[in-house]
A protein has these predicted regions:
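A cross-family signal for N-terminal binding/gating loops and helix N-caps
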Residues: 1-107, 111-115
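Phosphate/anion-contacting hairpin/loop surfaces
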Residues: 69-177
Length: 177
């Protein structure tokens, strides 16, 4: 599952590649991935991509008019930058964000479909994705220690609980330990 370091790389690359570019269209390749439809995918066409950031393990792509695409890659979801108008891979292609100079593909390998795409409007709609975990890259050592001691958890459980620490999961908790 992509965690903090992986998500940071996605965000940095996406900002470098697509910032300020208008989205030509948003294609949905598999309807299960779309977990909300207000606004509909068609409402994103023509809107400039403004920036990307993270809420926990979710990537937030902000477009003009306070339109947001919130992506949770889960275990096997990945993002790929391809040539303009790239076809979605059969079976694994979930969604495509088409820009004039390239296409951002959301794919998920494996048979279980866990990745999610939420389309929301208005900054207030993003609150539902907040789990409350401490953003470790902005935290002081004292805040980090307090977060780990706040509840009666094993160290492994505290590291992987999104209400304690944001964007750290099983893979990187093992590295930390």
């Amino acid at each position: 599952m992509p965690e903090l370091p992986d998500l940071t790389v996605y965000l940095e690359r996406l900002e470098a590649i697509a910032r300020d570019a208008p989205l030509q269209r948003l294609r949905i390749g598999n309807p299960f991935v779309l977990r909300s439809v207000a606004p509909p995918p068609s409402a994103f066409a023509g809107r400039r991509f403004l920036r990307a950031w993270r809420i926990g393990k979710r990537l937030v792509l902000e477009f003009e008019g306070e339109h947001y695409a919130v992506i949770h890659l889960m275990i096997l979801g990945r993002l790929h930058w391809k040539k303009p108008g790239a076809a979605m891979p059969k079976g694994s292609g979930l969604a495509a964000f088409d820009f004039e100079h390239g296409t951002l593909l959301l794919v998920e390998h494996g048979s279980k479909r866990r990745a999610a795409l939420h389309l929301v409007q208005g900054r207030g709609a993003l609150a539902e994705f907040e789990r409350g975990g401490l953003e470790v890259m902005q935290a002081t050592l004292e805040q980090f220690g307090e977060a780990l001691r706040r509840d009666n958890h094993t160290l492994k459980r505290a590291l992987t609980d999104p209400t304690v620490l944001a964007a750290i999961g099983n893979a990187y908790s093992d590295e930390i330990l």
